[in-house]
């Protein structure tokens, strides 16, 4: 007798369950997606012990006919595709026909379903075996209960996390589904306590408010773009509203939530230098495309996809985000902290905006006060700050648009994956309806972020603090400017322009600079010599494991030439494979930081005016190249509120 044998269906389903049903969140995902495919407009999810004891999904969808109930629990049985051509034009969330038999094989499952035009069907399955099947009275839709998950595969239970973590995984999945299908009303309960309720009115922003809070919803920038192949819609937060994890970015493709690193990277690239290192935005991006352009049959969980025109899609995302931010004045509003806000678990940001006309970058020249001969040398730091110019005295009134709900400036860093965001409350239908109506009203009252340009407003300097921060004012209130970050932005745009030019003017070194490397480093650098020439670094081999530099571009900051060369060499060694775009970017950022004013340096009146004028000419006067804010705004209203002049 041969050694190779065909596995029976029960064992095959248990093996398939290892991929499809990894944890309770997988069960919730598959069942809710089935409900959506069945045209449900209302779905309830009830959990006990994070789904390990019980998962119940109730929907008002099409239901399952009696003759289909048994077939639905057979392997690779589905109503969603018929032939191989359908496999390349998938519009439904499910299509593999693996979920139901896999779930039924590792749990005790009860199904009550009806199509509405015939008696319903009641089905009980335990470990893949049908225990009971009978007709029953039932409303249209499906009610499916999964109990004692993994009861017959106890080894799987050893790999389950804590109830808190497993519940976090489920809420994360439900949140993504709610965002991708705002037209469906979703209710999520855990141990009879409500965690989420969306209205199903199709307003994505209201769903985002339910998940992330109304404060975050107020800081959302609408994103919309269209090309021949793709349509993009969604919302992303202003650069100041960030989190410490990428998990707050959601990408939806043809109604399906997917995990795709390159899409998240494209969203980050859309922000470019607006985000601090290690910080990520909250974002929701829905992408519609011809199903022929995306392969969703990559993994049984259907979370991974492949795109046939990936580069075109990434470019569209980056350009769309960059264009949106160029229309907004990205000045953060410092806000006023209140006792009420100190009690809030989710602390959010409050900012204000206005817009900047890109201009040709030019070399900053703020070191010498106006009127001084360039040959003269004067130290930038002086012992006492100079008396600055005073603007004409005016009677200013706080604009009504500035009277807003106050909130703290510090961003929340609590990941949504760890625990449910909203406070658990005992379920009460009347209270629930009231809360939902109240949320709808709040979302409708949110003012759209003005997209009327991002020019820096006129700023009139009034002082300097600790030789680090410049104070300025205008009719909208007080502005605090970080002088180092401001000049860093000016220098960055200058160096970014210079470092990208092929034709370079060079300065000969009086004494060639020698660089000694290990053999591994030498070989790595030798491989990238041509790439280094593109950023103005010309190396000659000198001996066995050394290079020498005889010249450098004239725009290298004076006195820092060797330090910059060492830094660029270190980047090449660290990166292993040189990305010329990244290398130019890093070189520009490094030089801009080293050439900028440092803290504790007092500036003269002329220097401050020159700095602010140079800042005005930049394409992005709001953040330094590292993503830190350059200036912060205190509105007149907020100042008056702090001093109790208004209540």
UniProtKB/Swiss-Prot annotation:
This is DNA mismatch repair protein MutL. The keyword Heme does not apply. GO terms for molecular function: ATP binding; ATP hydrolysis activity; ATP-dependent DNA damage sensor activity; mismatched DNA binding. The keyword Plastid does not apply. GO terms for biological process: mismatch repair. This protein is involved in the repair of mismatches in DNA. It is required for dam-dependent methyl-directed DNA mismatch repair. May act as a 'molecular matchmaker', a protein that promotes the formation of a stable complex between two or more DNA-binding proteins in an ATP-dependent manner without itself being part of a final effector complex. GO terms for cellular component: mismatch repair complex. Belongs to the DNA mismatch repair MutL/HexB family. The lineage of its organism: Bacteria, Bacillati, Bacillota, Bacilli, Bacillales. It comes from Bacillus cereus (strain 03BB102). Keywords: DNA damage, DNA repair. InterPro entries: DNA_mismatch_repair_CS (IPR014762), DNA_mismatch_repair_MutL (IPR020667), DNA_mismatch_S5_2-like (IPR013507), HATPase_C_sf (IPR036890), MutL/Mlh/PMS (IPR002099), MutL/Mlh/Pms-like (IPR038973), MutL_C (IPR014790), MutL_C_dimsub (IPR042120).
